[in-house]
Structure formats: structure tokens, C-alpha cells
């Protein structure tokens, strides 16, 4: 696996994708947002979701109706009207970070859009460093799908630097039982694609399900780290002790993740 040269340029375009659901894509997006905001940089976040999930889009993020986009892709004019805000964020902004957060399982639509728009070329032309973060857990199907997504990204968006995100939600990636489906998927599918990536990001497990009550309450990572415990307890409905314990778990997780992000995206 190669290491991508770091850059102090604050103009980053970040595509975040997982081929399926419950892989950790949203947590990855929140971690990148927290990293940027801790440095005083406010990212522009576009979130692809179905109409049914529109209400889950956090305040301040731009909702893009993926249902309408599927229907519009065959018509260049229709697709442009839906996706134009993303292009404007790239062409009109200075010193910004633009995050594209795809809903899980949108591989075909994502690939079609990159092919039709050649958006990675626009990103490069406007002086942005382009990234594609592909998220996987250590389950066999997830690793196989992530490997395919990395391969597809290399074909449809060649100018984006690929990052493999290893989410340890169900365990690590270093001790699979010999002969297991996971061992085969890791060795035969994921490792060859990982070797072609610019970098890797590892998300350890957040102990004691510490993130779940905060996520359900709509809190950001920086909210959890910076708000008084009493306020966290009031917002989430947790007891003071449980709120403090959950925050400790999130803080320990962030202490491992944030240095990785700073090496990868040195925005401070």
C-alpha cells in the first residue's frame, strides 16, 4: 500500500462511499467533518438520500434526492439541474472542503454519475485535491464489495485518490480464521485493491456502544467532546454517569482516529 503525499492545501473534495448499509460511512463522514471543523474550516456537505430518508439529513447539510437523480441521469439537462449545486461549490468557492456523502448501496448511480459528468476532472481543474473514501467492515461480503468499489472508482474517477477505510465494527482485519470466507475475501479481494490505494484509515470500535446515544440525538463528534456532561445527559436522556462513560469511549476513539486524519488531510 502506497502512502499519499500530504498537502497543506485546504481545498479538498471528499467522496465517501460504502457499497452497502451499516458499514460506517456516516461515522466516517462525521469524523472528517469534525477534523475540519476543529481546524476552523467549515465543509460543504452534500448528502445523497432517498426521499424517505430526507428528514434524517442534519441541519447545514445539503440534501440531494437520489430517487430523482436516478430518473434524471439519462437526461443530461435533468441531471445537471440536480447536481449543479455540487459543481458550484467547486467552481465558486475558495479554500473550501466539499464532502459528497453517498447513501449506502448506490454503486451503479455513483458510477454512472462520475462517467457522465467527468466530475473528477473538474475537481482537479479547479485546484482541489480529490479523494474517495471507501468504507468496509471485516465481513466477507463487505470486503468483496469494497474491493469492487475501489476498482470501479479507479475506472470512473481516475483523478480521485482512493482511501480504504477499515471499520472495526465487527472486529479487526488481522486475525481471520484460516480457510474462512473472511480470510479469502481479505486476501484475494481486498488486499490487492488496498495495495493500489493512496492511503488507509482505520476506525477502531467505539467501546460500550458509546457513540450510539449521541448519534441518535443528532450530536456531532465535537459536540460530544466539548459539551458539559450535564448537557449531554439532558440532550440524550442518559444518566450523568452513563453520559460521562459514553463520552469517554468517544474521546478514546477520537484520540486514535484524529491523528490519522491529520496525516491524511493536514488542514490545521
Mark where each language-model region is.
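Generic beta-sheet signal
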Residues: 15-17, 43, 96-100, 130, ...
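Switch I (G2) and immediately adjacent beta-strands of P-loop GTPase domains
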Residues: 58-63, 86-101
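Switch II (G3) loop of P-loop NTPases
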Residues: 96-114
Amino acid at each position: 500500500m502506497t502512502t499519499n503525499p500530504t498537502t497543506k492545501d485546504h481545498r479538498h473534495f471528499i467522496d465517501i462511499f460504502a457499497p452497502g448499509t451499516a458499514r460506517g460511512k456516516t461515522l466516517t463522514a462525521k469524523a472528517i467533518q469534525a477534523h475540519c471543523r476543529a481546524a476552523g474550516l467549515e465543509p460543504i456537505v452534500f448528502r445523497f438520500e432517498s426521499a424517505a430518508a430526507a428528514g434524517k439529513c442534519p441541519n447545514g447539510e445539503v440534501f440531494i434526492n437520489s430517487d430523482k437523480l436516478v430518473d434524471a441521469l439519462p437526461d443530461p439537462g435533468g441531471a445537471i439541474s440536480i447536481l449543479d449545486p455540487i459543481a458550484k461549490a467547486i467552481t465558486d468557492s475558495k479554500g473550501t472542503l466539499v464532502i459528497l456523502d453517498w447513501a449506502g448501496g448506490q454503486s451503479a448511480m455513483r458510477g454512472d454519475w462520475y462517467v457522465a459528468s467527468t466530475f473528477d476532472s473538474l475537481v482537479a481543474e479547479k485546484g482541489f485535491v480529490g479523494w474517495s473514501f471507501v468504507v468496509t467492515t471485516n465481513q466477507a461480503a463487505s470486503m468483496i464489495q469494497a474491493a469492487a468499489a475501489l476498482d470501479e472508482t479507479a475506472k470512473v474517477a481516475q483523478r480521485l485518490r482512493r482511501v480504504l477505510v477499515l471499520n472495526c465494527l465487527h472486529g479487526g482485519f488481522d486475525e481471520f480464521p484460516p480457510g474462512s470466507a473472511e480470510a479469502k475475501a481479505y486476501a484475494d479481494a481486498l488486499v490487492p485493491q488496498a495495495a493500489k490505494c493512496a492511503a488507509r484509515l482505520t476506525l477502531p470500535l467505539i467501546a460500550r456502544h458509546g457513540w450510539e446515544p449521541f448519534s441518535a440525538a443528532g450530536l456531532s463528534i465535537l459536540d460530544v467532546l466539548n459539551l458539559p456532561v450535564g448537557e449531554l445527559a439532558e440532550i440524550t436522556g442518559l444518566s450523568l454517569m452513563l453520559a460521562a462513560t459514553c463520552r469517554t469511549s468517544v474521546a478514546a476513539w477520537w484520540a486514535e482516529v484524529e491523528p490519522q486524519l491529520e496525516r491524511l488531510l493536514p488542514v490545521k
